[in-house]
Structure formats: structure tokens, C-alpha cells
Amino acid sequence: MRFLLGVLMLMISGSALATIDVLQFKDEAQEQQFRQLTEELRCPKCQNNSIADSNSMIATDLRQKVYELMQEGKSKKEIVDYMVARYGNFVTYDPPLTPLTVLLWVLPVVAIGIGGWVIYARSRRRVRVVPEAFPEQSVPEGKRAGYVVYLPGIVVALIVAGVSYYQTGNYQQVKIWQQATAQAPALLDRALDPKADPLNEEEMSRLALGMRTQLQKNPGDIEGWIMLGRVGMALGNASIATDAYATAYRLDPKNSDAALGYAEALTRSSDPNDNRLGGELLRQLVRTDHSNIRVLSMYAFNAFEQQRFGEAVAAWEMMLKLLPANDTRRAVIERSIAQAMQHLSPQESK
């Protein structure tokens, strides 16, 4: 076992630390298109900022989604259409010309015109009627008429404001967000209860949204970030999981759950640079605790995926030394070792 540990430590110490860029583009044109798109899309939360300028979580998610859609070969129009379908026309700074937008532009002008006409008509009427019939009561009557004059304009303005908010103010999204925030504690208790029914995908999504809102209010909650990372992994949302675990790891690099969760999220990412960064983090974890089965398992998986087959074999063999003889995982590990050995040269396999 000391020999295996020595081999594993030697392999780990021989690897250089890598520095990465978060996003990698095929060429400069694609990078420029990404910048233009993120500057043209409005953040649903920070309504005066684009998703390129906002640091909110939802803006981060949208930037990541734009990047993923671009890597899939989607055109600029297809990406904008995807965002509009999810968040409405409000998400773009240049909404399309529709009957509704025309109505919203015309209504204020009509309201001003009607209000002006009403004021003019009532003023003319007071000039004709008051001197002839009620000269001594002209001032009180004029005061009473003045309040009524503004009533039609106020009513029209309230209608315009209500319609505008309902159609462009993301009312439905705000309602869903408020419901998710209120339901988050109960959903979390249910998720942690092994006897309760498991959450479905929609409930998990609501839980993630509610937890993110709570963490915005309490950003130092390490356990909350770790739990959000687990929810993101369960949803298959790499952006949520990676960001949550990364935040927890920054808050407490010595927290093993945060470090291992972050390493796993990076390892399971579709970005090769994330995979390499995950491998470096796992090397540090192995140096700290070379008897942790979870760490060794994830390290072996990461090494195998990056074709570092010698490191993978050493980690799996270390696991075999640590696991009981009747552990069902041994058979899977032995098959993995045999598969990795096929990729080693005769000198490496000795």
C-alpha cells in the first residue's frame, strides 16, 4: 500500500497547475458575437443593466446559456428567440413592433390629447356660465370643477400604467419567483427527508430559485451554497452547480464538501478547461486525504476522462486496498482498471 501511495503522490506532484479562461471561443468573431449578444439582452432582475454588465446570478446563467447555444451552432436570431420565449420581449432592448406595443405608444398621446381637450372645454364652459348665473360663487365653483377636470386623465393614465406593467413588467415571472421563495423552506425540508416523496424536476427548479433568492440575502451561508450546488447537480444545470460550489469553496477552501462538490462539478462539465481545473483540485484533495474513497473515486474518473490512465489505475488500486473484501464496488473498480490498462504502454503497465 505504501508503494501505491508513493506512485500516486509522484503522479500528482508531477502535474503542473493550470490556469484557465472561463470561456473559450472558436475564433475572435464568435467572441465578438458573444459580447454583442450579452450587451443586447436585458437582465430580468437588474432591469437597467444588460446581462453583460450585471453580476446577478440570473445574468450569469443567461451568459452561460448564450455561450452554450453558440457552441451548439445557434444563430444570433435563434438565441434571441430562445431568450424571448423564456423571459418575454422585455429581455431585449429592441422589442418587435406588435399591436400591443403600438397601443402602449399611442395610449399616452391619446390620454394627453383627451385630457387637454377636457381642460379646454371645461374652461370655456366656466367662462360662459359663471359670470351670467353665479357671479358671487365663481371661485368655489371653479375650485370644484378643477378637481373633476383631471379625473379622466388620471383614469386613462392608471389604465396605461396597469397594462404596461402587466405586459412588460414580467408580472408572471415575478409571481413565480415570489411563490418559489415562499415554498423553498418546505421543499428543502422535503428534499432532506428520506421518508418523503422525492421532488420532481419542477419542484427542484422552484427550490433552486428560492434558495438563490435566500442566498442573495445571506451570501455567507456556506451550507446553503453547498445545498444549492447539489440541487444544480440533480437538475443537470452545470451553471448553477458550478457557481454555487465555487462560491462555497471561496468562502471556505478547507470545507471538504465544498471542495469535492466543486471538483465534481468541474469534472462533469463539458468544458475541457473545467475538467483540467477539476483535476488540479482533486490532486490537492488527494494530497490532503489519500484515504477518502469519494475523493479517490472522483480523482480516478477525472484522470481516466483526461486519458491520464496511469493515475486512474493508481487511484483505483488504492481504493481496492481500502474497501472491504465483500464490497460490491470492487467488481466495478476491477473492470475499470482492466479497461484503463488496455490504454497503457508496456512500460507504464509494469
Swiss-Prot record:
- Cytoplasmic-side stretches of the chain, per the record, are 120-146
Q: Which Gene3D superfamilies match?
A: Cytochrome C biogenesis protein, Tetratricopeptide repeat domain
Binding residues for heme, per the UniProt record?
Answer: 43, 46
Regions of this protein lying in the Periplasmic compartment: 19-96, 170-350
Intracellular or extracellular location(s): Cell inner membrane
Which GO molecular function terms does the record list? metal ion binding; protein-disulfide reductase activity
**Entry keyword set:** Cell inner membrane, Cell membrane, Cytochrome c-type biogenesis, Heme, Iron, Membrane, Metal-binding, Repeat, Signal, TPR repeat, Transmembrane, Transmembrane helix
Record membrane topology? Multi-pass membrane protein
Per the record's keyword annotation, is Heme included, yes or no? yes
Q: What is the first-listed, main subcellular location in coarse terms? A: membrane
Residues of the signal peptide = 1-18
Q: Which residues cross the membrane?
A: 97-119, 147-169
One GO biological process this protein is involved in is: cytochrome complex assembly
> Tell me, what does this protein do in biology?
May be required for the biogenesis of c-type cytochromes. Possible subunit of a heme lyase.
Family, per entry: Belongs to the CcmH/CycL/Ccl2/NrfF family.
* Name of the protein described by the UniProt record: Cytochrome c-type biogenesis protein CcmH
Q: Which species?
A: Escherichia coli (strain K12)
